[in-house]
Structure formats: structure tokens, C-alpha cells
Amino acid sequence: MLAKHSKLFFTGSVVFLIVAIVLASWGFPKIISTRIQKSIQLENSSMMYDKWVKLPIPLIFKVYFFNVTNAEGINEGERPILQEIGPYVYKQYRERTVLGYGPNDTIKYMLKKNFVFDPEASNGLTEDDDVTVINFPYMAALLTIQQMMPSAVAMVNRALEQFFSNLTDPFMRVKVKDLLFDGVFLNCDGDSPALSLVCAKLKADSPPTMRPAEDGVNGYYFSMFSHLNRTETGPYEMVRGTEDVFALGNIVSYKEKKSVSAWGDEYCNRINGSDASIFPPIDENNVPERLYTFEPEICRSLYASLAGKATLFNISTYYYEISSSALASKSANPDNKCYCKKDWSASHDGCLLMGVFNLMPCQGAPAIASLPHFYLASEELLEYFEDGVKPDKEKHNTYVYIDPVTGVVLKGVKRLQFNIELRNMPRVPQLQAVPTGLFPMLWIEEGAVMTPDLQQELRDAHALLSYAQLARWIILAAAIILAIIATITVARSTSLISWPRNSNSVNFIIGPMVNDKMR
């Protein structure tokens, strides 16, 4: 009877050990991580869904201007001396309108941004401040005309003298709010055939930074970001992650197209990555070397490269930052060759220096993007300036800290600078003596830091995983101990081990030795 019970005990212990091994090696971590990952999938019932539709906290949008301090000297051939003014800080609220769901685990939506000035965070700077910056639309118009019809540059410039008020040099003296959102008025009311041609061109094909005046006024308003404020963009189509959580957030189409058309090349036209608001969890066995985001404002995807692990807010994260290869010249990164476009002259292949990126094919204007202060760009660009342009990794880098368990961004910053060529043109009075070079207007920073409440939620999720890790080893250890006890019990009951009768554990060890001596 004892042997039968011992065998049952042994069998149960072995089964428990097998179950414990399965739970320890796969079950507990998988169960907990699956529960956590299910909460981040874009389903109506998930914890993430409402936060994704309407961000619970605003992003922080900062603007820094390159104020020109020696405009008169530049007009006489001096190298530019610039003064960085900023940040002008805005709260950027984001809200999505869900349009429906696709057959391949996708969700379709429109994205709306709303910018609200934050005077407290701006530390005394106001939107009524005056700045002197490069005249972006003026230079864009002349560069475009010089490319299309060089002989017409002087005539068009006379028209532009009516289009712009007080056009004495290639610089604008404007208020911050007008340059960013309200708009700088450009006049189309005149009898010049060239002016009519310029305004007709704008009416037929105006860049997003230009909007027509209202209430019967004949003209346009130029602003850098008005087209992004309180207007919906899209539709975007994004993977929901309910079938494959590691594909969560990947954009599969934008404006009903699965690729952009700006670059005339399959690789460069590819839509790749997320909209930077949501990322998939990171598979610890297959950590991606690059993290892609799709940027519709520049018609391309950019990537940040894995820099390693980092601890932030007492949470282990993966740290990604933009690398020189992302905006490298074609000689340094042949993959970037397809971003070269002929936009200035027939003799120019459109391939720019290291660290700068041509926006003409995307925006319809000869603007050039870079990282702030030409960080990671060619040293040649810095030689153009007397002072005021000083790249600094800490201030000008783009980076993100990603929680591998949820894919949530703990902290992230995206930075971009807008430039245009200031070109010497002998037939244009305003440009007869200026030095030719790439001139920055402003740079922006868009970022967010996880709030303390959300940090605690994330730490709790990590703690749950840690408890599961601890529990699986405790259960495994208990199962092993139980299996050993069961083995000994079965062995004793079946006399596999010679157990002395009527002896306790101590007698079992020392008894025979004592008995021998007594003999």
C-alpha cells in the first residue's frame, strides 16, 4: 500500500516538474508579456487605443531662429554673423480621426495637429518679437527662375520688388508669429506682367508654405508652419498589431498610396516605419539596428541607429540616435544616391554635400534640410560663417529611448533645420555683392518626455515581469526538491536502497559503524 502511494507521489512530482520546467522556460514570461503586449495593440478595448487617438500630453515644439546681425555687411560681401534666438515654445496637441479598418490588420486615420504658444516655457520671448532672417520665398523664387529661365531673372526681380514690401536686400524683418503661423503678406496687386506671371504660377502650383489671402485681397501669405496647424493630414494606414505585435505602428500607405513619388526610385520612394508616435515592442533576440519613421513633410523615411542600452527613469531601454549615414552624401552612403535631383542647373547632378538634404522634389521650392547648426554635415558648410553656427551633439542630435517590452517612447527628440542658398547674382541689385553659401533660417525641435504617472505605470509592468521571472524559478526549485523527495520515498518503499529497520536517519548513517564496534 505504501509503495502504491509512493509511486503516485512520484508520478505527480514528475508531472509537476515537467509543468514547472515548461512554465519556467516559456510559460510565465510568455503569459505576462502577452498580456502587456495585448494592452498596446490598437483595439478599442486596449489601454493604448484612447491614448493613441488623443495624446494625453502635448508634444513640445520649439523653434530657434538664426537672427542676422550683420545684414549690411553681408550685402557688401562679408561672411554672415548669426545669433540664435529661442526657443519659442509651443504645445503641440495631436488628435486622430479613425476612418476605418483594413483587411490586413490595419487602421486608417487622419492626423490633426494644434500648436499653442507657451509663454512660460519661452522664458520671456514672445510671438511679437522681431527677427531678421533670410528671405526664404524671395530666394526660392529667384533660384527657381534662374534654373528655368536665367535670362528672365532681372525682369522677375523687378516684379518681386512689388511682391515683397521694402525689398532692399535678401533678408526679412518680421514678427515671429507672422513668420511661423499668421503669415507675411505678399502683394499681387499690380500692373506688371512679370508680377502677374509670378502670382499666376503661385495660383497654379503653390508650395504648402503659401496660402491665398482671403476677403478679396489680391495676394498670398507666407508662413513656415500654418499648413500644419489645425489642419488634418492623411489619410495614413497603419498596422494595428493585433496579428503581429512586432509590426505595430508600421505605416503601409499615405494618402492612399503605398509609396511617395518625389524621387523616381523604388528605394527612396518607399514608405517605411511609423509616424513616430508608436513603435512595436523589441524582440530581445532580434533587436533592430535601425528604427524608421516616415516624415511626410520631407517625403521620405528617416532612420535612427541603435547606439546601445541605457537606463532612463530606472527603466532599461534601447537608445537610438540619428547617424551620419542617414543624411550622408552618395559617396559615403550609395543608398542615398536616388535622393539626388537636378534642381539648379543642367550641369549640377543635384547631389549635395554631406549632411544636407534637398526638399525641392517634395515641397516644390529649393529648400535644403539639415540637422541643426549643420551637425553631422560637411565642414565646408561651416566655413561660410563668421560666427553663430556651432554644431553640438548634445543640443542638436535626434534620438529616442524605447522600452523594449511595450515599444513605448520614454523620451524622444526630433530636430530639423531649414536652409536655402543665398546666391550671388550680378544682375540682381539685392544680390550683387553677397557671398554665395547655404544659409539657415531656423531649426525646430519636436519632442516629449514620459510623465511621472506613466513612468510608474511602465515600472509596474516591468515589476510584474520581474515577479514572474522570480516565481518561475521558485516553482522550478520547489518541483525539483519535491521530485527528489519523491524519488527517495519510492526508493525506500521498493527497497532500492537498503534501509535499516527501526532506525532513524541518524542510525541509518552511523548505526552499522557502531554495531561493528560493539561486536
Swiss-Prot record:
GO cellular component, one term: cytoplasm
InterPro entries found in the cross-reference section: CD36_fam
Disulfide bonds: 268-338, 299-362, 340-351
UniProt keyword annotation of Glycoprotein present: yes
UniProt signal peptide: none
Keywords per UniProt: Cell membrane, Disulfide bond, Glycoprotein, Membrane, Olfaction, Receptor, Sensory transduction, Transmembrane, Transmembrane helix
Topological domains, Cytoplasmic: 1-7, 491-519
Membrane topology: Multi-pass membrane protein
GO BP: sensory perception of smell
Residue positions with a glycan: 44, 67, 104, 166, 229, 272, 314
Task performed by this protein: Plays an olfactory role that is not restricted to pheromone sensitivity.
Entry's transmembrane regions: 8-28, 470-490
Family, similarity comment: Belongs to the CD36 family.
Top-level taxon of origin: Eukaryota
Entry's localization field: Cell membrane
Protein's name according to its UniProt entry: Sensory neuron membrane protein 2
Tissues where the protein occurs: Localizes to both male and female antennae but not the leg, wing, gut, head or thoracic ganglia. Detected throughout the sensory epithelium, associating with both sex-pheromone sensilla and plant-volatile sensilla. Differentially expressed among different sensilla and different neurons within a given sensillum.
GO molecular-function terms, A-Z: scavenger receptor activity
Topological domains, Extracellular: 29-469
